[in-house]
Amino acid sequence: MIYDIIIVGTGAGGATVAHELYNENLNLLILDKGSNIPLGNAVNKIKITDLNLEIEPLEDNTEYEFLKQPAELMEIVGVGGTTLVSLANACYACTSCYKNSATAQFKVHSLELFEELLDASKELKVGSLPSHMMGPATKRLVKEGEKLGYFMEPMPKFIDFSKCDNCGLCLVGCTKGAKWDATDFMEDIKSYGNPPEIVTGFTVTRVLHNEGKVEGVEGTDKNGAKTIYKSNKVVLGAGALNTPQILRNSDITQDVGEGLFTDLFITVGGFLKDIKLNKEIPMGVKSEFGPYFLSPHYSAQLVSMIRDKGFELNESDVMGIMIKIADESNGKIHSDGTITKTLTNRDLKLFEKGYKKSVELLTAMGVDPNSISSTAIRGAHPGGTASVGKVVNKNLETSIEGLYITDASVIPQAPGRPPILTITALAKRLSNNLKEELGSL
């Protein structure tokens, strides 16, 4: 059998393409190397990868706690991808927040996503967190922040607030059906009268091609058996860490795996009795500062760190603020899968600015200054490893005809903002292009 399209990956990109095309009378095959993850169990599937972060020589002697811990990169393997553990942040990645936003970057390459962003927002039920859903900790942060002159705005979320009980467990995987994730699209596909074939536990190793045209994919099934699937087109949505390896194995090497960014972040927090941030919708508001932003965020890592400083506390006694930056796109995924990256002085200065503002906000809220701690530097939004203008063109097509990419690897530089809405819009654009092309054949 020769499929019309093989879709690799079921995260925001792959699932959206599948959802857009499943009722278009096309012969689709959807592949994912992960399996179905039970509701509420997604956080246990998070994979932590070492991020070999080289730190440029510091311009001052300040010893920040977050520089003393190994940096980490977070990903998840399973149907739905990282959408399962997202905090439902639907950032539009527009220039009003950051002049080098994802949308601005795409415009340079004649890729305009305005209509697709609106369409994605409607389908994902995006809306700003309403004031009645903000918990006491978030409201207190807003109050103190505004006293200090910081503009705090509600975070756009892909949450159906009529179903949300404010449990604060978005990271675990929503069991209430309130938070959108890519499995919602996959369930729609499965319930279709004539659903496409879906194969889980299948690892694509390379794309087959002949004379510059796609012929299918090769990979291994859950039992380790090598299998070949034939198709006229292939859409890669395997994620910015996996897509480069598939491309390299498929004879596309120029600029592949280079330019990695991860939207690095830390969470700074301290002891504030019974603040109960852990029981609120996470990251309910944000304060924008161009290449970085601040948002209330509970991190379980902070509990033991604060205890180590002599404080007796429970999880409900932690107040935290996330600092997320648009880090420089200087990382690399090597052929053996190891990841290296440099934390530049520019990156560090952004963290320093955010750290100082966070400490100011925390102490204004009443956090004991002696308890203030910082998590390790982490990256949860890897991208840039197969960017538009280098590895793909404005139609998201590679040098192999019929091979497309629709994940964060095509974003050229770090937007410093959650990318799910952007990826969904990209996937909708690609889907529209494929409909037009296949409809004319």
Question: Model-found features: residue ranges?
Answer:
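A glycine-rich dinucleotide-binding beta-alpha-beta segment and adjacent secondary-structure elements
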Residues: 166, 170, 199, 205-210, ...
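Helical element adjacent to the flavin cofactor pocket in flavoenzyme catalytic cores
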Residues: 165-232
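Helix-loop-beta segment of a Rossmann-like dinucleotide-binding subdomain
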Residues: 96, 123-128, 152-192, 337-343
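An active-site-proximal "capping" alpha-helix that borders the catalytic cofactor pocket
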Residues: 421-437
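Rossmann-like flavin
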Residues: 83-164
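Glycine-rich loop(s) and the adjacent beta-strand/alpha-helix scaffold that form part
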Residues: 20-23, 34-39, 44, 191, ...
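FAD cofactor-binding and catalytic pocket of flavoenzymes
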Residues: 60-62, 67-68, 73, 82, ...
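N-terminal glycine-rich phosphate/pyrophosphate-binding loop and immediately adjacent elements
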Residues: 1-99, 219, 254-271
